[in-house]
């Protein structure tokens, strides 16, 4: 993990949910009970690389909401 950068995870309306450090891991829980762990890398205030894919944090939140996937720090 690098120099103290934190990724502020929000919902699709930009409400803060939690933060994870650069290199931190989130747990995604699917509706069928399966879970998945993803590494998060800080890009800038509004963007992160999650499981190797670059997202605007709000876009990621919208996709998770649309697919009914909950997520939290691991």
Model-based region annotation:
Residues 1-19:
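Mixed-charge, Lys/Arg-rich low-complexity intrinsically disordered regions
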Residues 8, 25-27, 47:
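Residue-level detector of beta-strand face positions
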Residues 12-13, 31-33, 52:
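Glycine-centered tight beta-turn/hairpin loop motif at sheet-sheet or coil-to-beta transitions
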Residues 18-31:
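Short coil-to-beta transition motif at edge beta-strands of beta-rich domains
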Residues 35-44:
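Short beta-strand-centered aromatic/proline hotspots
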Residues 46-53:
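Short, solvent-exposed secondary-structure boundary/capping segments
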Residues 53-74:
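Intrinsically disordered, low-complexity, charged/polar segments
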């Amino acid at each position: 993990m690098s120099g103290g950068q934190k990724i502020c995870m929000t919902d699709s309306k930009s409400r803060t949910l939690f933060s994870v450090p650069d290199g931190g891991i989130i747990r995604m829980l699917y509706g069928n009970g399966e879970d998945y762990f993803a590494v998060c890398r800080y890009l800038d205030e509004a963007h992160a690389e999650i499981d190797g894919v670059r997202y605007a944090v709000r876009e990621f939140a919208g996709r998770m909401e649309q697919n009914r996937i909950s997520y939290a720090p691991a």
